[in-house]
Amino acid sequence: MIENITVLVDNDSWILPYAKDLVDELNKLDKNATLAQHHDAVNAGDVCFFLGCTKIAAPSLLSKNKFNLVVHESALPQGKGFAPIAWQILEGQNEIPVCLIEACDDVDAGDIWLTDTITLNGTELACEWRELQGLISIKLAVRFVNEFGSLVPKKQTGQVSFYPRRRASDSELDVSKTLAELIPLLRTVDNEDYPAFFEHEGCKYKLEISKYE
């Protein structure tokens, strides 16, 4: 039985409010759930959920809990690595697979405990698909806790591929493309941290995007 749970977010991530909601949901189930924002704040227990983490988890950290679980949004082992939803939006995908996997030494290589799907309609901006990402992370974590006794993890099988880290330069718009061609990229940019931009006649311009109701 799962009783003692830590939810870890080791940076100032957009997912932090969802991590707090997850802790609340787990405590409503009469679990002993806590939020940690540093690796050294993780308690010894049954499960640690790693949400939006960016730092490498040392073996000493992983040894604190029986299960160390990560949410990854791709059909693993395809799409390991960084920003899988953004990359799949750029590929034109609307059905985004989501896996709850065991954290291990190799990147995104752990056994798969649960799967689900985020369904997009093709219009969502980053703030909107991030909300779906946060909600499905909560859903999978709660399912693991509730269904643990009947779950059987599966090994990853198939062709392996990796997504590279997205950087601010990836938000540059190609002014030779039509607006319609640029929509997928505009759906992945963050107006604050990595806004869309373009260069023209030696000047750099920033574009901010939001829905206009």
Residue ranges, per PLM feature:
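One-carbon transfer enzymes
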Residues: M1-E213
